[in-house]
Amino acid sequence: MAEPLLVVGLGNPGDNYARTRHNVGFMVADLLAARMGSKFKAHKRSGAEIVSGRLAGRSVVVAKPRCYMNESGRQVGPLAKFYSVPPGDIIVIHDDLDLDFGRIRLKIGGGEGGHNGLRSVANALGSKDFQRVRIGIGRPPGRKDPAAFVLENFTSTERADVPTICEQAADATELLIELGLEPAQNRVHAW
């Protein structure tokens, strides 16, 4: 039996972070779990919450680390080891300041762009060569600190678009699973 793909939505645990820009990865992971018809449960060895099943015809484990964003690797590393998933078969869904609000991009490897959650995952895996679903949250206005900006709730105008953006990011994740990186990029980057 082929090893599953590991899909990780990044975010911070707790109700006070649930609607923040930094938590779009969790929002998309929740949508994927709903599409799989499953609910998250605790994974004892890693501490993350997981859902196992099938997406786009593949065996998939969707995970939400239950530690803070900057420590995500502490739970992603043990999950990857437990399921014997190499970095190239891991998809991390995360917010991205360098993309305009609502833009979705797919890539593999590369830098972290100041995203400490990505840095933590890369350090835990010993590799940056995992796939990424990048969800644009835009840059903070004026001289606002990016670290504070990502922990704020979406504006009321943005909030109206977040459900559609998360659905598109979930669709992009399924295309990545089904088609592989380059064909999925060709489709998603044309949106």
From Swiss-Prot:
<dbReference type="GO" id="GO:0000049">
    <property type="term" value="F:tRNA binding"/>
</dbReference>
<comment type="similarity">
    <text>Belongs to the PTH family.</text>
</comment>
<dbReference type="GO" id="GO:0004045">
    <property type="term" value="F:peptidyl-tRNA hydrolase activity"/>
</dbReference>
<dbReference type="InterPro" id="IPR001328">
    <property type="entry name" value="Pept_tRNA_hydro"/>
</dbReference>
<feature type="active site" description="Proton acceptor">
    <location>
        <position position="22"/>
    </location>
</feature>
<keyword id="KW-0820">tRNA-binding</keyword>
<feature type="binding site">
    <location>
        <position position="68"/>
    </location>
    <ligand>
        <name>tRNA</name>
    </ligand>
</feature>
<comment type="function">
    <text>Hydrolyzes ribosome-free peptidyl-tRNAs (with 1 or more amino acids incorporated), which drop off the ribosome during protein synthesis, or as a result of ribosome stalling.</text>
</comment>
<dbReference type="InterPro" id="IPR018171">
    <property type="entry name" value="Pept_tRNA_hydro_CS"/>
</dbReference>
<dbReference type="GO" id="GO:0005737">
    <property type="term" value="C:cytoplasm"/>
</dbReference>
<keyword id="KW-0963">Cytoplasm</keyword>
<feature type="binding site">
    <location>
        <position position="70"/>
    </location>
    <ligand>
        <name>tRNA</name>
    </ligand>
</feature>
<dbReference type="Pfam" id="PF01195">
    <property type="entry name" value="Pept_tRNA_hydro"/>
</dbReference>
<feature type="site" description="Discriminates between blocked and unblocked aminoacyl-tRNA">
    <location>
        <position position="12"/>
    </location>
</feature>
<dbReference type="GO" id="GO:0006515">
    <property type="term" value="P:protein quality control for misfolded or incompletely synthesized proteins"/>
</dbReference>
<feature type="site" description="Stabilizes the basic form of H active site to accept a proton">
    <location>
        <position position="95"/>
    </location>
</feature>
<dbReference type="InterPro" id="IPR036416">
    <property type="entry name" value="Pept_tRNA_hydro_sf"/>
</dbReference>
<feature type="binding site">
    <location>
        <position position="116"/>
    </location>
    <ligand>
        <name>tRNA</name>
    </ligand>
</feature>
<dbReference type="GO" id="GO:0072344">
    <property type="term" value="P:rescue of stalled ribosome"/>
</dbReference>
<comment type="subunit">
    <text>Monomer.</text>
</comment>
<comment type="function">
    <text>Catalyzes the release of premature peptidyl moieties from peptidyl-tRNA molecules trapped in stalled 50S ribosomal subunits, and thus maintains levels of free tRNAs and 50S ribosomes.</text>
</comment>
<keyword id="KW-0694">RNA-binding</keyword>
<feature type="binding site">
    <location>
        <position position="17"/>
    </location>
    <ligand>
        <name>tRNA</name>
    </ligand>
</feature>
<protein>
    <recommendedName>
        <fullName>Peptidyl-tRNA hydrolase</fullName>
        <ecNumber>3.1.1.29</ecNumber>
    </recommendedName>
</protein>
<keyword id="KW-0378">Hydrolase</keyword>
